[in-house]
From Swiss-Prot:
Subunit (UniProt): Heterodimer of LeuC and LeuD.
Underlying gene: leuC
Record lineage: Bacteria, Pseudomonadati, Pseudomonadota, Gammaproteobacteria, Enterobacterales
GO molecular function: 3-isopropylmalate dehydratase activity; 4 iron, 4 sulfur cluster binding; metal ion binding
Cited function: Catalyzes the isomerization between 2-isopropylmalate and 3-isopropylmalate, via the formation of 2-isopropylmaleate.
Record protein name field: 3-isopropylmalate dehydratase large subunit
Binding-site list for [4Fe-4S] cluster: C347, C407, C410
GO biological process entries: L-leucine biosynthetic process
Gene3D superfamilies, per the entry: Aconitase, domain 3
């Protein structure tokens, strides 16, 4: 019987299945951070249980770390407690930890792939909704809650029901300046923020194959923003070349054997999907969100939509509420909207390719008066590589702030946040009310578009910036 990639990955990891019961899956990799793990470790301690597979468990600090200093006290008391608990728990249970002073420390979904912890064919979980990022490698990766974190720590397994399948095909070639971020925002604009609910999405088509691994990670990172359980891209030579030689990747003959298996990780001819969505890459322009969910998105050359133009009463009410929160008026060109802050970073867009794209725009220009612009590399290795390439100097000379690795302004859990009413061009993944700080207004864009907003002081079409 012909199977989709998702079905192959799921079936290969079923440990036990009985009639009328949720299947039990084996988990190959468990990624841990300071926010969703303390209670899970406390649960192990209370029941006198060890971590079953410490060698398959990797921890880092990211959500509430300061990006201005490596001082554990810098982000407040709660952050300090969570980070100290992670240090204590990893020491006690034998889990490898990339702490604030470790050269590999960084955002969990940046660290995993760059250290070769993430490999094709694996099941990967983390107490974080954007675990879908790792699906870029052809791995079944999804976020879990704290009680499930404890279950995986104790058993290396997890009960999971089968999801529906969705194929999103992006045909043709994207125009110059159009990035994976624009592609995925255009997809969510078409499906809506709940269009993938109950599904695992496989992204395919010529435009997807043309993406680098960084681009594919951006794509899968935001699968959750259309309501999907996970996102997938079938592995290919781009994947294998990225993985080869990384710290935890197979070496020598083991790598060659692994590649032979990884080549089988693709949807069979004749396999059927529950839902199919198609987009033409050449029709995708630079995208900017205008509302308070990622599905409320338009091209940078468009005008702010009028809620009256929505036929669906729920969408109309949502648009009215979003415009009121965002302080925007219908009919205004997006390029007339001024910004206060710019954030280039997050598990969506903080990799070396993202920083290069932003630096290309920043080079020889200056951040607009009154704008604060942050560049936050996703990990220690990304920061080191960017500095070796001189990107930090480009940003600093242009007036951007060059920070230490962390989740930063993606979410208001550290010192990097918006003040009420401030408007931000952000390369992160969520533009919900208050996501970047109480009363803050978030517009999601690509790294190049964020840099363009920083130097012009308003949203600008990257295609018109020479």
């Amino acid at each position: 019987m012909a199977k989709t990639l998702y079905e192959k990955l799921f079936d290969a990891h079923v440990v036990f299945e009985a009639p009328n019961e949720t299947p039990l899956l084996y988990i190959d990799r468990h990624l841990v951070h300071e926010v969703t793990s303390p209670q899970a470790f406390d649960g192990l301690r209370a029941h006198h249980r060890p971590v079953r597979q410490p060698g398959k468990t990797f921890a880092t600090m990211d959500h509430n770390v300061s990006t201005q200093t490596k001082d554990i006290n810098a982000s407040g008391e709660m952050a300090r407690i969570q980070m100290q608990e992670l240090i204590k728990n990893c020491n006690e249970f034998g889990v490898e930890l990339y702490d604030l002073n470790h050269p590999y420390q960084g955002i969990v979904h940046v660290m995993g792939p760059e250290q070769g912890v993430t490999l094709p064919g694996m099941t990967i979980v983390c107490g974080d909704s954007h675990t879908a990022t790792h699906g870029a490698f052809g791995a079944l990766a999804f976020g879990i809650g704290t009680s499930e974190v404890e279950h995986v720590l104790a058993t290396q397994t997890l009960k999971q029901g089968r999801a529906k399948t969705m194929k999103i095909e992006v045909t043709g070639s994207a125009a110059p300046g159009i990035t994976a971020k624009d592609i995925v925002l255009a997809i969510i604009g078409k499906t809506g923020s709940a269009g993938g609910t109950g599904h695992v999405v496989e992204f395919c088509g010529d435009a997807i194959r043309a993406l680098s691994m960084e681009g594919r990670m951006t794509l899968c990172n935001m699968a959750i923003e259309m309501g999907a359980k996970a996102g997938l891209v079938a592995p290919d030579e781009t994947t294998f070349n990225y993985v080869k030689g990384r710290l935890h990747a197979p070496k020598g003959c083991d790598f060659d054997e692994a590649v032979e298996y990884w080549k089988t990780l693709k949807t069979d001819d004749g396999a059927t999907f529950d839902t199919v969505v198609t987009l033409r890459a050449e029709e995708i322009a630079p995208q900017v969100t205008w509302g308070t969910n990622p599905g409320q998105v338009i091209s940078v050359t468009d005008i702010i939509p009028d809620p009256a133009s929505f036929s669906d009463p729920v969408e109309r009410a949502s648009a009215e509420k979003a415009l009121a929160y965002m302080g925007l008026q219908p009919g205004v060109p997006l390029t007339d909207v001024a910004i206060d802050k710019v954030f280039i970073g997050s598990c969506t867009n903080s990799r070396i390719e993202d920083l290069r794209a932003a630096a290309e725009v920043a080079k020889g220009r200056k951040v607009a008066p009154g704008v604060q612009a942050l560049v936050v590399p996703g990990s220690g290795p990304v920061k080191a590589q960017a500095e070796a390439e001189g990107l930090d100097k480009i940003f600093i000379e242009a007036g951007f702030e060059w920070r230490l690795p962390g989740c930063s302004m993606c979410l208001a859990m550290n010192n990097d946040r918006l003040n009420p009413g401030e408007r931000c061009a952000s390369t992160s993944n969520r533009n919900f009310e208050g996501r970047q700080g109480r009363g803050g207004r978030t517009h999601l864009v690509s790294p190049a578009m964020a840099a363009a907003a920083a130097v012009t002081g308003h949203f600008a079409d990257i295609r018109s910036i020479k």
